[in-house]
């Protein structure tokens, strides 16, 4: 018994010792490595779930959290849900993210990246065109990549890969290089403005900086290619520009690839030589990595990466080559191993990627030998999900948290970037009357985009009303602090309205669409049918918007509605929400399911569910409840209580829509 008590007090003194890192003192030797989450909104903004996710990592007890893969340009994003820092409007979200990390006691670092040829863009940037010498290896790596995924996913992935390979024919010119250098420096300055303590440049994983270093991807004969020093010219130019833009002594780290595992690729001797150049440039630390998307799916690489501390020997050589702090990564699975690597002088810092995501209590459990760490089993489920644009998730997380994460990711496309559709003066008045519904969260909302749909012929009276409405919007929103993005106004003629609206929704990455209700104009109702994966609101004239009824069928659609409400109207003072269910089965089963749903959505366990006994059918029961309860707003899942798999037509939500008089209706798809 005494021995057990003694063990529980045991910690790893070296692992939990402090270390000076640039201007900052790290409280221990543990770093949350950058692992791409895919938790940003489609327009690149920080989402509330991303902030919550990184705050949880910071709360784990690590000394530093590195936010992964922030694109410095639109053509540098590796994912549809990539965090971005290429415009000033991203600064408020980044500032909230940095603040959330630092509030939990960790140093906040933002990793900046340009994905180069791996970017999701029609015209990817790359040092030189792909030639026949590495085409065969790319094709072979595609085979290994495809075997990594279920058969039904392979066709679309193959088509995407072939499309990318075809685009790998146009090399960057001098203008491209100068622009990207500027993109890195400006993004770094935005990170500083947002309150991050450090910035890291991503020079690994086969992304753009790595592509210039590698003879596999850089076939330029001279200048920015050729010999080793020529191939270092571009990344060094980026570093110089970034350091010039940042305040003096602001810490700048570098994610360094030690081995590329491709023909003519970066190997340890060149990596160590480059590390010494980085040290001379004033880099604050080096974070080691290995492999690229061209190599990590090969059987040989999978075997290497399956071993614990597989970069141990290489990082030991790196530490001997430089005097700045080094971070080791690569399956550091236990605190004992982590402590030993620091004690032995293999590395100064321990990087925890997937192990810390698998068990956010890893650090706290390391201080208590009586608690068992949930290990990462290297199943790569998280990687598959990220590649398939489904967001980071872990097979070892509790089921409720996995489900919650899936829901949060689905809401990223309903990203609260709003579009107001207005065609006449009556619409403008309706929007003014429905102001409480338009402002869902004062802390996280931004200016809407107003799309005016008008007749081809000029109407001076209508144009004057539009100007007044724009001014009303500014006067209303500015006092609320909506300053992170400008008010955008778009005007379209009446010809082919619906096509123009759809184009604006897609082009603008709008997640919420507000329309004024008018039963005489069928195009408004058709909007609810056509747009998918959005929040669609039909605004009525009822002035009791604060009294909200939420019909739920306890399907997956209900969970989406619950998460949406938790982020919006449930936070607003003065709103009263009633959750109702038309009972068609056993009340006990419904109550149990409601209890489970509240856990998944993070609802207060005391929120009740009102059960309605239908006299005839579900639609009649709901519409009667809406009318007798004098509700002003209805919020429900688009598929309706019947759980039908078609869009809206014939569903319960369609029936409710037909019977509404002056209420506002929100459909969450």
Segment roles from a protein language model:
Residues 1-416:
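Flavin-dependent oxidoreductase catalytic cores
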Residues 432, 439, 498-547, 626-669:
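Gly/Ser-rich helix-loop-strand patches that form or flank binding pockets
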Residues 413-467, 478-485, 545-610:
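Small/aliphatic-rich secondary-structure junction motif
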Residues 32, 110-112, 254, 328, ...:
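Structural beta-sheet core signal
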Residues 104, 248, 281, 322, ...:
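Helix C-cap/helix->beta junction micro-motif
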Residues 421-425, 491-492, 515-519, 552-554, ...:
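Structural motif
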Residues 489-500, 613-619:
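Charged docking surfaces used in two-component/phosphorelay signaling
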């Amino acid at each position: 018994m005494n021995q057990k008590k003694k063990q529980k007090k045991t910690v790893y003194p070296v692992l939990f010792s402090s270390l000076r890192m640039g201007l900052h003192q790290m409280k221990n030797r543990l770093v949350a490595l950058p692992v791409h989450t895919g938790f940003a909104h489609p327009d690149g903004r920080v989402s509330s779930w991303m902030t919550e996710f990184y705050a949880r990592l910071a709360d784990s007890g690590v000394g530093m959290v590195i936010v992964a893969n922030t694109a410095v340009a639109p053509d540098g994003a590796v994912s549809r849900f990539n965090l971005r820092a290429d415009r000033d409007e991203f600064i408020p979200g980044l500032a909230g993210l940095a603040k959330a990390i630092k509030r939990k006691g960790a140093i906040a670092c933002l990793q900046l990246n340009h994905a180069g040829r791996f970017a999701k863009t029609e015209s990817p940037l790359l040092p030189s065109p792909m030639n026949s010498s590495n085409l065969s290896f790319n094709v072979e790596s595609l085979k290994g990549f495809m075997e990594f995924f279920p058969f039904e996913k392979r066709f679309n992935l193959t088509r995407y890969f072939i499309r990318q390979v075809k685009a790998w024919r146009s090399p960057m010119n001098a203008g491209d290089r100068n622009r990207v250098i500027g993109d890195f420096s400006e993004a770094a300055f935005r990170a500083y403005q947002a309150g991050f303590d450090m910035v890291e440049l991503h020079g690994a994983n086969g992304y753009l900086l790595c592509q210039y270093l590698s003879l596999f991807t850089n076939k330029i004969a001279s200048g920015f290619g050729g010999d080793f020093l020529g191939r270092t010219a571009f990344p060094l130019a980026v570093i110089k520009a970034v350091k010039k833009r940042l305040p003096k002594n602001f810490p700048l780290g570098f994610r360094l690839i030690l081995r590329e595992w491709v023909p003519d690729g970066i190997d340890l001797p060149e990596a160590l030589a480059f590390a010494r150049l980085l040290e001379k440039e004033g880099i604050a630390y080096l974070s080691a990595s290995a492999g690229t998307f061209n190599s990590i799916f090969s059987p040989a690489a999978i075997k290497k990466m399956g071993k614990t501390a597989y970069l141990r020997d290489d990082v030991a050589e790196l530490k001997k080559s430089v005097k700045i702090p080094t971070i080791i990564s690569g399956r550091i699975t236990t605190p004992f191993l982590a402590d030993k690597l620091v004690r032995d002088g293999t590395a100064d810092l321990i990087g925890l990627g997937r192990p810390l995501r698998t068990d956010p209590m890893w650090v706290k459990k390391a201080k208590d030998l009586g608690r068992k760490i949930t290990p990462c089993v290297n199943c790569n489920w998280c990687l598959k999900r990220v590649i398939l644009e489904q967001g980071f998730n872990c097979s070892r997380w509790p089921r409720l948290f996995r489900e919650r994460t899936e829901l949060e990711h689905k809401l990223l496309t309903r990203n609260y970037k709003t579009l107001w559709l207005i065609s006449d003066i009556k619409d403008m008045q309706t929007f003014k009357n429905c102001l409480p519904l338009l402002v869902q969260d004062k802390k996280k909302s931004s200016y809407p985009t107003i799309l005016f749909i008008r007749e081809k012929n000029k109407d001076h009276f209508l144009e004057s009303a539009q100007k007044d409405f724009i001014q009303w919007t500014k006067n209303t929103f500015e006092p609320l602090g909506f300053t992170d993005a400008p008010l955008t106004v778009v005007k379209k003629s009446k010809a082919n309205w619906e096509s123009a609206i759809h184009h604006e929704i897609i082009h603008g990455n709008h997640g919420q669409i507000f329309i004024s209700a008018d039963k005489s104009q069928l195009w408004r109702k058709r909007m609810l049918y056509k747009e998918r994966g959005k929040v669609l609101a039909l605004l009525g004239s009822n002035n009791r918007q604060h009294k909200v009824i939420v019909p739920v069928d306890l399907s997956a659609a209900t969970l989406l509605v619950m998460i949406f409400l938790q982020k919006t109207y449930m936070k607003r003072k003065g709103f009263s929400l009633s959750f109702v269910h038309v009972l068609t089965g056993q009340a006990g089963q419904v109550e149990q399911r409601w209890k489970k749903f509240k856990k998944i959505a993070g609802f207060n366990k005391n929120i009740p569910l009102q059960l309605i006994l239908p006299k005839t059918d579900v639609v009649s029961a709901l519409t009667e409840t809406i009318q007798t309860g004098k509700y002003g707003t209805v919020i429900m899942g688009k598929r309706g209580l019947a759980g039908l798999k078609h869009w809206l037509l014939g569903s319960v939500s369609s029936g409710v829509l037909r019977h509404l008089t002056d209420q506002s209706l929100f459909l969450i798809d």
